[in-house]
Amino acid sequence: MKNIAIIGASGYTGAQITSLIHADAGLSVQGLYVSENSLDKGRELSELYPLYSHLPYVLNPLSDDVKAKIVAESDAVVLATEHSVSLELAAWFYQQGLAVFDLSGAYRFADVAQYPKWYGFEHTHPDVLAEAVYGLAEWNAAEIAKTRMIAVPGCYPTASLTALKPLKSLLTSAYPVINAVSGVTGAGRKAHLHTSFCEVSLTPYGVLGHRHQPEIATQLGQEVIFTPHLGNFKRGILATITVQLQPGTTEEQVKQAYEVYDNSPLVTVKHNAFPKVDDVVHTPNCHLGWKYDANSGYLVVASAIDNLMKGAASQGLQCIKIHFNL
């Protein structure tokens, strides 16, 4: 039994991964934690989320004494915190010997020069960053098992990379074009006018400037055009991706490329059939569907995931189970 502390548990992702860890026979929840300044400190998680009325956990303030208690009682810590908060907490817990599963973007780029541009801070822990592994579970399992610093991927990158990585050797130099729509839970739990019930509407955002674009490009090894959209639904992501394949590529080669997922139970691949968000919401699954026009050389692949599950919490759980061989 591995004990897992969860910091930032009051948010959607933190609450979701709490429920998953609680339900796993090989894991136990050491405790839930929020900032000492949080309005939610001292409250039960079920007060915030009646859906989780079966979870008997209080949101404790994260003091220095509490951090020491976490180190003494835990095998790992999950960080569902702001990027700048994870930057410091991840390094501290890693240096104390715990395994760290960071759901923020603070350790996703190996290159420290990326952080000022995309996250607005200088990376102050390059030594810990050098140990970090990108936690794309179906692709990096061997590395996840070896390191104690796992940067769980973003939601859009998970959907996009799961679709694109099998095709890498077949791509031309043309940029893949990714159009993706996410439910409003992707914007977090804090209230904002543009995500309120009466205001939310399907619209693109972060055009040619979203931080997930370089994350996708870095992990794919090729530049991409990425346009995210806000959808008027609660959860889920659908990414529709258009790519150009090398001249002479056959449909059979594409089928063979996607056979990489034959032993990946959470990834389903269909030819000439396309996924929908409703089929993956509240699941850890990724559904892919593709169609190829050999005459033009263009392939369209669609990828559907739950942004809070495969795009965050359940992939975090995958990484935990891979790391601890559970």
Curated annotation (Swiss-Prot):
Known catalytic reactions: N-acetyl-L-glutamate 5-semialdehyde + phosphate + NADP(+) = N-acetyl-L-glutamyl 5-phosphate + NADPH + H(+)
Biological or metabolic pathway of the protein: Amino-acid biosynthesis; L-arginine biosynthesis; N(2)-acetyl-L-ornithine from L-glutamate: step 3/4
Principal place of residence: cytoplasm
Cellular compartments per GO CC: cytoplasm
Keywords noted in UniProt: Amino-acid biosynthesis, Arginine biosynthesis, Cytoplasm, NADP, Oxidoreductase
Enzyme Commission number, as recorded: 1.2.1.38
Active-site positions on this chain: C155
CDD domains reported for this sequence: AGPR_1_C, AGPR_1_N
PROSITE patterns: ARGC
GO BP: L-arginine biosynthetic process
GO molecular function, one term: NADP+ binding
Subcellular locations according to the entry: Cytoplasm
Disulfide-linked positions: none
SMART domains recorded: Semialdhyde_dh
Function of the molecule: Catalyzes the NADPH-dependent reduction of N-acetyl-5-glutamyl phosphate to yield N-acetyl-L-glutamate 5-semialdehyde.
Family: Belongs to the NAGSA dehydrogenase family. Type 1 subfamily.
PANTHER family the UniProt entry points to: N-ACETYL-GAMMA-GLUTAMYL-PHOSPHATE REDUCTASE, CHLOROPLASTIC-RELATED, N-ACETYL-GAMMA-GLUTAMYL-PHOSPHATE REDUCTASE, CHLOROPLASTIC-RELATED-RELATED
Protein name stated in the entry: N-acetyl-gamma-glutamyl-phosphate reductase
Organism of derivation: Shewanella denitrificans (strain OS217 / ATCC BAA-1090 / DSM 15013)
